Curated annotation (Swiss-Prot):
Residues 398-401 are annotated as: G3. GTP binds at residues 352-359, 398-402, 452-455. Keywords: Cytoplasm, GTP-binding, Initiation factor, Nucleotide-binding, Protein biosynthesis. GO terms for cellular component: cytosol. Residues 45-91, 127-209 are annotated as: Disordered. This is Translation initiation factor IF-2. CDD domains: IF2_eIF5B, IF2_mtIF2_II, mtIF2_IVc. Residues 343-512 form the tr-type G domain. It comes from Bartonella quintana (strain Toulouse). The keyword Protein biosynthesis applies. One of its GO terms (molecular function) is GTPase activity.
């Protein structure tokens, strides 16, 4: 029996660790610094032995499948049973040495794998592929080594006594936790001491690691890996990568959009955001462009038209510059068609002194009593009426006669065709009569003199004609061209003759207008009526005005609701030279404002807003004194090219005024002269200030002062009043102001000549002529002429004047020097340089 048993024992197979009894699963762990480790969890099954093997086997230790937990798993060593220890005759020291060898091999393999992964991470483009390739290469090399080196076999002596069972150890190179690392380090240290004591002892090789089925799903995201990878960063999914590739392909295949060039309308000022919207660009792009130009701005900042044009051109757009005043283009001064012109009635203005019978004369002409309705017999507003004589119509405008309404009288003179100057035969020429003459002459309209109150016993028509000669009004009976008619508003004497004289003068003027075009005219007066609202009396000068027309008058606009004539009747249209009342204005315009018909309300509103804004700016300018000095007025006249110096002179007596006027007339020459717009004896009144504002004149007071109302009006209008009590001081100041209008005189002074001896080229300076002064002297900064063969080829200024390498101010005759010209280098030896100086001398009268 013993022999048979021994025979069976001798033929047993070599001791091996069979891997077929293990079911493996892989769990990936992440550590700091980008390191990862795959841990294999193995489940041991029952080992099945062959029937011919009578050796007693120990029950296999089954380790349950360990699911990945967030807590660190505990490491349990698989210890052999006492029976197997007794049968294998292995001491505990040998078993511990074998375990330590296995752990050391595992740790060494992990260290090697980490080094390989560290090297693979440094390669950016193929990080993951290279790391997997290195791992596969290492595993393949280990398999080849195991094929060459078979597993360690037990000695024949130990196998003869007992059969050794395979030891199933649930430890693999990939299931070591942090606790296992500490134990492995302790085992490694103990093994080093044991190796020193037993250097001849053979080492046990690490069993080969076999890739399980789960290794193929290493890069997949599973529930176990998601629970185990705490704190790890999840990578991009395949769907995200696929979307990214599709987006990149679309961007590659998409054709670039063609730049669209637009016409950008740029006003005087515009915000960056509005400019970007008009260019169809982003505000950020415009701000980036400004940042490149070293301008830090925001979308809401306002820039001027020049900067806006630069930005628009830089972005590839065309620019159309517009001004705020462009909104008024196309409403005034439209050219009339000569073929459509038709005769129109003349517009006649009744002018004259207060209480000389202007309204009474007009009332006699109209055959209607309007005098009784006036306060104190004085006309308080401009009345416009139309009468008919021999089938021809005449439009009359009655202006107030007293001095407080000088500005209204000036507006009336601007709209009239013929001025009828009413002078009382018993009162002769008065101050307001002279003002009316001046207004008529300034407007350039012909004058017809109506000598009224001829029926009175004290009437002296010849005296009136003689006094009119002093104001340059020459009537026909005195050898002039001005028509005069002796009339009586009370008795109606010669009224028909006056109307015939007006029609005769109108025939000479050949007055025509186009009634088919849009209406245009002037506001005669405006008022606010409690029942009807704003009511404006206008004079149609061109075209025909209809109800429902949209008009702009000064700073106001409105739609015509009704047209009322001078008899209070509603009419359907107003032809040229027709005075008419209009209802429907949004506000009350000023007397003298021009009106015109526009196409739609938006344009009318835009024009009115622009004019209101302009009026506010002018009011601010007056308060700051923009026109408050005589010097600024002189500068304005000089820039506009006007050579006349307008003045309004008021004195204490008529003799002083005549002396001042005579002295001022002597100051003029062929370039500039003084023009006295108005002069008179007495204090400075509101009428004088209004006339100065209308004619842009200076106000001079000689031994007189302005009253309180005139001072307030002058301050409001920004008119300066100068007072004098010595006639010579007055003349000297006016002379100095008028002298400023004269252009200065240029006088040339010869300094010397120099001859060019040699020409030198000097760095950073250019050509320098070495000269000798042969006549006079050379001064620094003087003018020079280059003469070659007695021909002047260049005239300019000196750039450099040196003597012995030093800058000098002048060089005397007989000395040598170096000369360089400004922006000119065509100089040759033998040329002659002429030096001169130009002096500007102010001219005086």
């Amino acid at each position: 029996m013993s022999e048979n048993n021994n025979d069976k024992i001798t033929v047993k197979k070599t001791l091996t660790l069979k891997r077929s009894v293990l079911e493996t699963s892989t769990v990936k762990q992440n550590f700091s610094h980008g390191r990862t480790k795959a841990v294999v969890v193995e489940t041991k099954r029952r080992k099945i032995t062959r029937t011919d093997e009578k050796a007693e086997t120990s029950q296999p230790i089954t380790k349950p499948h360990v699911a990945p937990q967030r807590s660190k798993p505990r490491f349990e060593e698989a210890k052999p049973s006492e029976s197997s220890m007794a049968k294998s005759n292995l001491s505990s020291a040998e078993m511990e040495a074998r375990l330590r060898a296995l752990e050391e091999a595992h740790i060494q393999e992990r260290i090697t794998r980490e080094k390989v992964e560290e090297q693979a991470r440094r390669i950016k483009e193929r990080e993951e592929s290279l790391r997997q390739a290195v791992q596969e290469t290492e595993i393949h090399q280990e398999e080849q080594k195991e094929e060459k080196n078979p597993p360690v076999q037990t000695s024949p002596l130990s196998s003869a006594h007992s059969s050794i069972e395979p030891i199933d150890i649930a430890i693999t190179p990939k299931n070591i936790t942090v606790t296992e690392k500490r134990k492995a380090d302790e085992i490694k240290n103990d093994d080093r001491h044991s190796r020193r004591a037993n250097p001849a002892k053979s080492e046990v090789r690490t069993p080969k690691v076999v890739k399980g089925a789960n290794e193929r799903r290493r890069g997949k995201l599973t529930l176990n890996s998601a629970l185990d990878e705490e704190g790890s960063v999840r990578g991009r999914s395949m769907a995200a990568m696929r979307r990214r590739q599709e987006k990149f392909k679309r961007a590659q295949n998409q054709e670039p959009k063609e730049k669209i060039s637009r016409e950008v309308v740029i006003p005087e000022t515009i915000t960056i955001q509005e400019l970007a919207q008009r260019m169809a660009e982003r505000s950020v792009d415009v701000i980036k462009f400004l940042m490149k130009q070293e301008q830090m701005m925001k979308p809401g900042d306002v820039i001027d038209a020049d900067v806006a044009e630069l930005i628009a051109v830089e972005f590839g757009h065309t620019v159309k510059r517009v001004l705020e005043s462009d909104v008024e283009e196309g409403i005034f001064n439209i050219a009339d068609n000569p073929q459509k012109m038709q005769p129109r009635p003349p517009v006649v203005t009744i002018m004259g002194h207060v209480d000389h019978g202007k309204t009474s004369l007009l009332d006699a002409i109209r055959k209607a009593n309007v005098v009784s309705g006036e306060a104190g017999g004085i006309t308080q507003h401009i009345g416009a009426y139309q009468v008919e004589q021999n089938g021809q119509k005449i439009t009359f405008i009655d202006t107030p006669g007293h001095a407080a309404f000088t500005a209204m009288r000036a507006r009336g003179a601007r709209v009239t065709d013929i001025a009828v100057l009413v002078v009382a035969a018993d009162d002769s020429v008065m101050p307001q009569t002279v003002e009316s003459i001046n207004h008529a002459k300034a407007a350039g309209v012909p004058i017809i003199v109506a000598i009224n109150k001829i029926d009175k016993p004290a009437a002296d028509a010849q005296k009136v004609r003689t006094e009119l000669l002093q104001h340059e009004v020459f009537v026909e009976t005195m050898g002039g061209e001005t028509l005069e008619v002796e009339v009586s508003a009370k008795t109606g004497q010669n009224l028909v003759k006056l109307l015939e004289a007006i029609l005769l003068q109108a025939e000479l003027l050949d007055l025509k207008a186009d009634p088919k075009r849009t209406a245009e005219g002037v506001v005669i007066e405006a008022k606010l009526d409690r029942g009807r609202g704003s009511v404006a009396t206008v004079l149609v000068q061109k075209g025909t005005l209809h109800p429902s027309d949209i008009i702009v008058a000064g700073n106001e606009w409105g739609r015509v609701r009704a047209l009322i004539d001078d008899h209070g009747r509603h009419v359907k249209e107003a032809v040229p030279s027709t005075p008419i009342e209009i209802l429907g204005m949004q506000g009350t315009p000023q007397a003298g404002d021009r009106f015109a018909v526009v196409t739609h309300e938006a344009k009318a509103r835009e024009i009115a807003e622009y004019r209101q804004r302009l009026a506010r700016d002018k009011a601010v300018a007056r308060q700051t004194g923009s026109r408050s000095s005589l010097e600024q007025m002189m500068t304005k006249l000089q820039t506009t090219g006007i050579k006349e110096f307008p003045l309004i002179v008021k004195g204490d007596v008529q003799g002083s005024i005549e002396a001042i006027a005579s002295a001022l007339e002597k100051l003029g020459n062929e370039e500039v002269r003084a023009r006295i717009v108005h002069s008179g004896a007495g204090g400075i009144t509101e009428s004088d200030i209004s006339l100065a504002e209308a004619s842009n004149s200076a106000v001079i007071g000689f031994n007189v002062r302005a009253n309180k109302q005139a001072c307030a009006l002058a301050k409001t209008q920004g008119i300066e009043i100068r007072y004098y009590n010595i006639i010579y001081d007055l003349v000297d100041d006016i002379k100095a102001a008028m002298s400023g209008l004269l252009s200065p005189e240029q006088r040339e002074t010869f300094l010397g000549n120099a001859e060019i001896l040699e020409v030198f080229n000097i760095t950073k300076i250019g050509k320098v002529a070495g000269c000798r002064v042969i006549e006079g002297k050379i001064e620094r900064g003087a003018g020079v002429r280059l003469i070659r063969d007695n021909i002047v080829i260049h005239e300019g200024k000196l750039k450099t004047l040196k003597r012995f390498k030093d800058e000098v101010n002048e060089v005397q005759s007989g000395q040598e020097c170096g000369i360089a010209f400004e922006n000119y280098e065509d100089i040759r030896a033998g040329d002659t340089i002429e030096i001169f100086r130009i002096e500007h001398i102010n001219r005086t009268l």
